[in-house]
Amino acid sequence: MYAVIRTGGKQYRVAPGDVLKIETAAANQDGQIEFSEVLAFSGETGSVVKPGAAKVLASVEGEGRGDKILVFHYKRKKQYKKLQGHRQNFTQIRIQEIQIDGNSYRAQ
């Protein structure tokens, strides 16, 4: 049983109990995040969901920064070199529950 959600401009396939790193997201006071943009849902029958019919609840486990990515610009014969680094911020979450049409699917 899984769902496909969209957050941070990316799509993720999630199931109850999954741990994943997403783009930095704001959580509630109690550390919960609710994803209401569910694109697809697979249960016993597997189906595409109507907008607003399903939601995914997750809890925040931590925040951090990803590995450094180096960007190197170089122009030959001109002695031009520029090195720049980038570390993307992320939020680590654990999927607690998938709710659709009054039914709730939780992690075992």
Swiss-Prot record:
It holds the Pfam family Ribosomal_L21p. GO terms for cellular component: cytoplasm; ribonucleoprotein complex; ribosome. GO terms for molecular function: rRNA binding; structural constituent of ribosome. InterPro entries: bL21-like (IPR028909), bL21-like_sf (IPR036164), Ribosomal_bL21 (IPR001787). GO terms for biological process: translation. Signal peptide: none annotated. SUPFAM superfamilies: L21p-like (SSF141091). Keywords: Ribonucleoprotein, Ribosomal protein, RNA-binding, rRNA-binding. This protein binds to 23S rRNA in the presence of protein L20. Belongs to the bacterial ribosomal protein bL21 family. Part of the 50S ribosomal subunit. Contacts protein L20. This is Large ribosomal subunit protein bL21. It comes from Acidobacterium capsulatum (strain ATCC 51196 / DSM 11244 / BCRC 80197 / JCM 7670 / NBRC 15755 / NCIMB 13165 / 161).
